[in-house]
């Protein structure tokens, strides 16, 4: 908190009660299934965060599954060069894990509201979710490219990990996440919006100095980071502004940032991305098959064990859910 790029009046004076754990989940339900988040940070109330603290949980086996579920073909297609590809292969998973941890633990826990300012859901309204996710992302990005990570023993090569993380964030925010959208659609989901407005604003902010370069080669578009140090400064500048928006409850600034950079999609690039992605069979979103957990009881009904059995397929799971738990009345 003390070393972040936030304005002094927006920094917590006394950071308390920040805890972090990684757990493996046996199954999920509700809005966490079949497509799940990779981490959870609570509480949502900022006054509780300020006075008591916050707790973060990363879902370790979920992160591992996401990282190992796809091939490297899509990366090869959208990475600008061999260096970007090799950095992602060697350091990308660790960079992603660290970004998730920094996002959840430090990002959501950082900063404070100005006295008398309401909760973001009241002041920033429909932009509160994407603004908060972007703010947490930016805090993580700001510290991902820093030697302190190596001093703490978290990485062996902080610069390579940071470069891989920055490459991946820009590549996803400006290109690869667009495979989830139909051509002509706006970006609606809060996390997708925040990744786009963070990336697009940073690209625009550094355009004069060519910090991030748009490369056209053989009819394809790529993005290449020419100056990682400068990009970190830009992330810090945007972090400072997003915290100001939250701390002051500046709805107009949030609206301008999100609508200006996070909603509309460059249709020409979008069409190109979808065309280049046609060669890959992997789905745009990941879904999970939950095991069936059956209690094993003794003659008195006491549970002695749990039998874990996986169903035949994702499709079978969803049909069984509809059969057993589809309680909505159909006309």
What role is predicted for each listed range?
Residues 5-10, 118-123, 149-167, 253-258:
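Short, glycine/acidic-rich hinge or "gate" loops at secondary-structure transitions
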Residues 95-112, 136-137, 141:
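Active-site recognition of the HExxH zinc-binding catalytic motif
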Residues 141-245, 251:
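Long, well-structured alpha-helical subdomains associated
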């Amino acid at each position: 908190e003390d070393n972040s790029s936030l304005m002094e009046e927006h920094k917590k004076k006394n950071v308390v009660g920040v805890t972090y754990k990684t757990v493996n989940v046996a199954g999920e339900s509700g809005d966490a299934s079949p497509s799940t988040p990779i981490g959870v940070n609570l509480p949502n109330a900022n006054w509780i965060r300020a006075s008591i603290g916050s707790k973060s949980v990363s879902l370790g086996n979920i992160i591992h599954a996401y990282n190992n579920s796809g091939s490297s073909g899509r990366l090869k297609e959208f990475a600008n060069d061999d260096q970007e590809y090799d950095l992602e292969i060697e350091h990308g998973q660790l960079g992603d894990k660290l970004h998730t941890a920094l996002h959840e633990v430090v990002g959501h826990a950082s900063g404070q509201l100005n006295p008398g300012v309401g909760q973001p859901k009241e002041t920033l309204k429909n932009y509160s979710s994407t603004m908060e996710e972007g703010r947490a992302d930016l805090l993580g990005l700001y510290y991902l490219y820093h030697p302190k990570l190596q001093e703490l023993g978290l990485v062996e090569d902080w610069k390579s990990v940071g470069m891989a993380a920055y490459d991946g964030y820009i590549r996803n925010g400006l290109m690869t996440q667009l495979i989830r959208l139909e051509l002509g659609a706006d970006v609606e989901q809060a996390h997708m919006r925040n990744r786009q407005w963070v990336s697009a604003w940073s690209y625009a902010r550094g355009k004069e100095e060519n910090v991030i370069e748009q490369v056209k080669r053989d009819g394809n578009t790529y993005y290449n980071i020419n100056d990682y140090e400068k990009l970190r400064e830009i992330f810090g500048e945007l972090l400072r502004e997003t915290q100001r928006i939250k701390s002051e409850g500046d709805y107009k600034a949030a609206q301008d940032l999100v609508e200006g950079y996070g909603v509309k999609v460059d249709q020409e690039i979008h069409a190109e991305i979808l065309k280049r992605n046609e060669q890959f069979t992997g789905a745009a979103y990941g879904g999970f098959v939950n095991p069936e957990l059956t209690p094993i009881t003794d003659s008195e009904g006491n549970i002695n064990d749990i039998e874990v059995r996986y169903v035949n397929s994702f499709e079978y799971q969803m049909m069984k859910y509809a059969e057993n738990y589809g309680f909505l009345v159909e006309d």
